Amino acid sequence: MARFIFITGGVVSSLGKGLMAASLAALLQARGYRVRIRKFDPYLNVDPGTMSPYQHGEVYVTDDGAETDLDLGHYERFTGVAARQSDNVTSGRIYQGIIAKERRGDYLGATVQVVPHVTDAIKDFARAETDDLDFVLCEIGGTVGDIESLPFIEAIRQLKNEVGRDNAISVHVTLVPYIAAAGELKTKPTQHSVRELASLGVQPDILLCRCEKPLPDSERAKIALFCNVRKEAVIPALDADSIYSVPVQYHGEGLDSEVLRAFGILDAPAPDLTAWYDIMDRKQHPEGEVTIGVVGKYVSLPDAYKSLNEALVHGGMAHRVKVNIRWLDAEMFERDEDLVANLEPLHGILVPGGFGERGSEGKIASVRFARERNVPFFGICLGMQMACIEAARNTSGIANASSTEFGPTDEPVVGLITEWMSAEGLQKRGANTDLGGTMRLGAYDAKLSPNSHVASVYGTNEISERHRHRYEVNGAYRERLEKGGLVFSGMSPDGMLPEIVERPDHPWFIGVQFHPELKSKPFDPHPLFAGFIEAAVKQSRLV
C-alpha cells in the first residue's frame, strides 16, 4: 500500500511547494523508494490550457497529452518519472465530471454536494494507480485559508483517517519573514497558518520554514511549541543559489529523515546523492559561459518559458558552461529598435513557442539575422514556423508568405491542422472548434532523414517528442523551401506533417515543431539543447 504525503502552503503563495515536493521525492527515490507526485489545483479552469501565460506561466504537456501545471515539470525533471494526465487535477475538472454524472442520472436522484461527492472525487484522484508505489506526494495548490482550497483540505483530512495515520502525513510549507527594522525573524505568521490548517482538521506533522536568514534553534523550539510538532520536525529552508542544490540542502536539514520517521520507518537505506552532487558541481563550477538570446512574446514573465529556461541550463551542464539568457521582446524589433545591437553579442538565438500575430515580424527578423550571420539558431514550435516563413520570403521568393493564424493570406506557408492521427485514432479540427484541449497534444513519433544534422544530434532516425500546436507548416511548400536551402529533415511517420527543418549550409540551424524542453532533465540533458549550447560555445570563440 502506498503512503501519502500531503503538502500544503501557508502565509503567502509562491513559497516553492512544487520544488519542495520534487526535492523530497528525489530524496526518497535516492533511497530506493518508488515515488509519484500529484498536483491539486483549486481553480475552476478544467486545465491551464487556455489560461494566459501571464496568469499561469508555462503549460506543461505530458506524453499522454495533458495540459498541466508547470510544477509537473519540476516533478519530472527531479525524479525522471514521466508525468501523466492522472497527476494533475483542478476543481474545474472535478466539477465537470460530477455535473456530467448528475446530468446522466448516475447519482440516482441524490442531492449532489461538496461533501461527499466533491471530496470523494478528490480522494479517488489521489488514490488512482498507486498500487505499485511506495510514496505518493500530493501538493495542494494555493494557500491555506483560501476559499477555493477548502474541499481539498477536507478531502485530505478524510483520506488520512481512511488510510490510517501511519500511512499519511502532512507537510506544511510556511514563511518565516525577516523584519530588517527589528533584525528578527518572525514566527507569528507560521503559528497562525498552522492554527488555520488545524482548525480544518489537518494537523501538520512537519513544517518546512522558508526563510532568508538562518533560523535560530530558539525560534525552532518556539515554532514547535506553538504548532504542536517536534522541534526536529521544524525544518529550515533557506533560499538556495540554484534549484538544483535544494535536494542536497533539504537532506542536510533532515527533511527526508524526518518524513521517514513520521511514517515509523527507521531502517531506511541511506540515499545515493551522487548524481545530485555532480549536477551541483557542474552548475557551480562552469568552465566557460555563453549568452543565448530568447526572442519571444511573454519574456516579461520567465515562468512562461520555465522548461525552456531549465533545458538551456541543462545544455550548459552537459558542456560545463554557464548559460546567460537574454530575454528579448520580439515586438521591440518591430519598433525599429536596433536589431544588430541586440543580437550581435549573442552566441545563439532561440525563438520559442507561442501564439498569435503579435511579435511575429520581430521573430522573423531574428531568424533572418541568425541565418545571414551564421549564428546558431534554434526554433521551437512557432519558432520553426517563423523560420519557414522567413525562408519562404527571403530565400524561396514567396514574398507574401505568412500563417493563417495571423489572418487571411495568399501564401499560407503555415496553416491550421485539420486532420492527424493520434493514439485514439483520426483527429479532426476546424476553425470553430473549442480552444480548450483541442490542439495536437502529447507525444508523437517522427522519422528523421538519414545523414541529416538532426539525426546526428539525436544519434537515431526515430524519435518521440511532445507537441502542443494547432498550426503546422504547409507541406505543399516543401519543394520550394528546400530549393531555397531549408531542408525538411523530420516528418511524421505517415510523411504528412513536417516535424523538423534545418539548413545544411549553416553551422547550426534547426527548427522543430515539438517542444523538446519538456523532456530535458539535469542528469539527462536533451540532445537538441546540448547540441545548441555546444554550437554556441564554438560561436563564442568567434565573436
Curated annotation (Swiss-Prot):
Q: Name the segments for region: Amidoligase domain.
A: 1-265
| Keywords carried by this UniProt record | ATP-binding, Glutamine amidotransferase, Ligase, Magnesium, Metal-binding, Nucleotide-binding, Pyrimidine biosynthesis
- Catalytic machinery residues: C381 (nucleophile), H515, E517
One GO MF term on file is: ATP binding
What InterPro entries does the database record attribute to this sequence?
A: Class_I_gatase-like (IPR029062), CTP_synthase (IPR004468), CTP_synthase_N (IPR017456), GATASE (IPR017926), GATase1_CTP_Synthase (IPR033828), P-loop_NTPase (IPR027417)
Q: Which residues bind L-glutamine?
A: Y54, G354, L382, G383, M384, Q385, E405, R470
Name all Glutamine amidotransferase type-1 domain ranges: 291-542
Listed binding positions for ATP are: S14, L15, G16, K17, G18, L19, D71
The pathway where this protein functions is: Pyrimidine metabolism; CTP biosynthesis via de novo pathway; CTP from UDP: step 2/2
Which residues does the annotation say bind UTP?
Answer: S13, K186, T187, K188, P189, T190, Q191, K222
Entry function: Catalyzes the ATP-dependent amination of UTP to CTP with either L-glutamine or ammonia as the source of nitrogen. Regulates intracellular CTP levels through interactions with the four ribonucleotide triphosphates.
Report the sequence similarity comment from the record.
Belongs to the CTP synthase family.
Its quaternary organisation is: Homotetramer.
Protein name per UniProt? CTP synthase
